């Protein structure tokens, strides 16, 4: 979510019997085994003479073959399409992938080589497990969504498909008071198209669809116990936009490599801008330089707070603040074929209760009811109007606007460059262990 300036069959063990296989039975020889038994019965009957021969040979009932996977029924499950199996049922004992690990450089290299420092980092295991679980959920849903989204689909269908998958994988549907604060959506699914760079999700009744020639930014968050994983990608169907998408990917990777404890924000911004603005894109016979959107930034992430207070610029100059140990950052880049500057535009859909919300008297009764529901269900996590609809709220706009004007709830309107331009986004989370 953008910050704006001014922002296997689990080890199945078979009995290793040392006795010789009966009648030359092989590993794949069920049929041979049955035939051999019948032969033995015939020999026994012949040895008993006429009495045995007179007896009808009993037919052996064929053995029931075990169903594939039955032996591993208690083992890990596999994911479905769309994703609906909670990840803790796939990754047993919370053994989630660690993700990409970058070694500390220069004067911070001791954090990698010191056994004591690495031991202290491992003491934060519960904290990291929450992040890794959230990251695995995000990766799974992101991977599925890339293949699933097709031209002609409505934005509402796409947003709800992603959000239903996230809730299923966390195991929390968020329909009971407080459930959405245990785990679920870190913030609403952003589906910002073309010149709109961020903070757009469909409200109820929205009829917009994604078209073949569109450039859509898919930005959604997953949280586990308030640890928010914020990641985004740009989806296109026409290869003409490939360079625009690649510019953001490469710039984000440059920012991630530059980031680290004691690194100045301005240095990260310079590295990002150098890579981003080395690209250009040709659209309909006209060549456009890819520009950084200079008033959009990455940001630190707090506990239950998507914008933690520090910003990571994507252009050179400016903030000399350093990254510190124990902090989590969303390294986020935006490229544009337009002016490289965004303004508030279109209908607002994203909101969040302020962590420093003032205590003021609310004279609108619907505002009081709505605030109580927001506090119970979202806390300071961002939400959108569709989430209020999902909880059964009706005719709440007056109360919501009252909360915004009172400074209790922050509104995040869509951020757009000039019409006719195209914008792209790439984002990943980086965590710097504390010692």
Swiss-Prot record:
Region (Disordered): 1-87
InterPro entries cross-referenced by the UniProt entry: Creatinase/aminopeptidase-like, Met_Aminopeptidase_Type2, Pept_M24, Pept_M24_MAP, Pept_M24A_MAP2, Pept_M24A_MAP2_BS, WH-like_DNA-bd_sf, WH_DNA-bd_sf
Enzyme Commission no: 3.4.11.18
One of the GO biological process terms: proteolysis
Cofactor(s) essential for the protein: Co(2+); Zn(2+); Mn(2+); Fe(2+)
EC category name: hydrolase
Chief localization: cytoplasm
The keyword Transit peptide is assigned to this record: no
Keyword Transferase: no
Sequence positions that bind a divalent metal cation 1: 219, 230, 427
Location within or outside the cell: Cytoplasm
NCBIfam families: met_pdase_II (TIGR00501)
HAMAP family: MetAP_2_euk
Family stated for the protein in its record: Belongs to the peptidase M24A family. Methionine aminopeptidase eukaryotic type 2 subfamily.
Protein's UniProt name: Methionine aminopeptidase 2
